[in-house]
Design a protein with these regions (language model features):
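Internal alpha-helical scaffold of NAD(P)-dependent oxidoreductase catalytic cores
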Residues: 102, 113, 138, 142-146, ...
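NAD(P)-dependent Rossmann-like dehydrogenase/reductase catalytic/cofactor-binding core
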Residues: 215-216, 244-254, 262-360
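General beta-strand structural signal in soluble alpha/beta enzymes
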Residues: 122, 147-152, 192-196, 317-319
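NAD(P)+-binding Rossmann beta1-loop-alpha1 motif at the extreme N-terminus of oxidoreductases
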Residues: 16-72, 82
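Rossmann-like NAD(P)(H) cofactor-binding subdomain of soluble oxidoreductases
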Residues: 74, 80, 84-165, 181
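Conserved active-site and cofactor/substrate-binding residues in soluble primary-metabolism enzymes
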Residues: 26, 34, 54, 82, ...
Length: 360
């Protein structure tokens, strides 16, 4: 009842013409744009930043992000600017909606204007290539005194921007801050849960891209539903195995940022990672694949980072290792599948068996 009253209150703000707190979105890609539309619908004063003056002028004039969200109209209340300082000033929440490899450079750029009471919300799903760090760790190195929330889950911008039913998770060790972000984004079409396990939520969002790439590769090779089901199921096991070794709670991988995001990314043509996998399964080179997808494919870097972390921690990651060999060692996709299928026999629940859990 209380949540319903809060949602109705937000709608009254809009209908009454009253604007709530200012928030800003850094980045004008598809996901940042979709979240800006959500925040605007919820009654917030939304400002977006891009360094691309042409893109800013186009959206301010035509009210459409033709590059990333064609056909979706931006309300006039959303302001687009190339002036970073004015966009950030007085914003209660700063949404970082840039590719994972750009997060550090963007945070370095904004940290001289960010105040300590502003909440940072990262929505990228990746790991930093040079350091192997999660994005919350990257941001904390640059802005150690700000509260930080990861917003993740099974969500395609193409659907969120059209206000189709979607669920997300706001993760932070500080649940009070996570609830502020939860309240900011919730509406009748977007349900947001909270989770204190930010490590697990971040890793779920990053690692599922590796498995989605593999699922796409299976499609490109012409394999059926059986192969994809096996890959997804063993993939979530692998995600949990690496996640726990990196400090996550295994149950997080059964939630929205784990199984939830894995399902949507492995099965939808909205998924860049799956599309990239399809193209490489069909025989295209990595260079040809990236040119055709023409957007950031986070799973490519995530594969490299996870492979290196797995080797360092001595974690068994057969699917990740196989995809790494395709991306970075020029292995043939069909050969890697054969290698996976002909490995030595194992128990399905290897960890359970090794811990002595056997029914009499």
């Amino acid at each position: 009842m209380e949540q319903k009253e809060n949602l109705e209150k937000k709608n009254k703000f809009i209908l009454g013409g009253v604007i709530m707190d200012k928030v800003c979105v850094i980045g004008l890609g598809s996901w940042g744009s979709a979240l800006a539309l959500t925040l605007c619908k919820n009654g917030y004063e939304v400002h977006m930043w891009t360094r691309n003056e042409f893109q800013a002028n186009e959206i301010n004039t035509t009210r459409e992000n033709s590059r990333f969200l064609p056909g979706v109209i931006f309300p006039k209340e959303i302001k687009i600017s190339t002036d970073l300082e004015s966009v950030i000033k007085d914003s209660k929440i700063i949404v970082l909606a840039v590719p994972s490899q750009a997060v550090r450079s963007v945070v370095k750029q904004i940290k001289h204007v960010v105040k300590e009471d502003q909440i940072l919300v990262d929505v990228a799903k990746g790991l930093e290539r040079e350091t192997g760090l999660r994005l919350s760790q990257v941001v904390k190195e640059e802005l150690p005194n700000n509260e930080y929330v990861t917003l993740s889950g099974p969500s395609h911008a193409e659907e969120v921007s059209r206000f189709m039913p979607t669920t997300l998770v706001a993760a932070s060790p500080n649940l009070e801050i996570a609830e502020i972000v939860q309240d900011a984004f919730m509406n009748p079409q977007l349900r947001v849960y909270t989770n204190p396990d930010i490590i697990g939520v971040e890793l779920g969002g990053a690692l599922k891209n590796i498995i989605a790439f593999g699922a796409g590769m299976c499609d490109g090779l012409g394999y059926g539903d059986n192969a994809k089901a096996a890959l997804m199921t063993r993939g979530i096991t692998e995600m949990g195995r690496l996640g726990v070794a990196m400090g996550a709670h295994v149950t997080t991988f059964t939630g929205l940022s784990g199984i939830g995001d894995l399902i949507v990314t492995c099965t939808s043509m909205h998924s860049r990672n799956r599309r990239a996998g399809i193209l490489m399964g069909e025989g295209k080179s990595l260079e040809e694949t990236l040119k055709e997808v023409d957007m950031v494919v986070e799973g490519i870097v995530a594969t490299e980072v996870a492979y290196k972390v797995g080797k360092k921690l001595n974690i068994d990651l057969p699917i990740t290792n196989a995809i790494y060999s395709v991306l970075y060692e020029n292995a043939k996709p069909e050969e890697t599948v054969r290698t996976l299928m002909t490995r030595s026999k194992k128990n399905e629940m290897e960890e359970v068996v090794n811990n002595g859990f056997v029914h009499n």
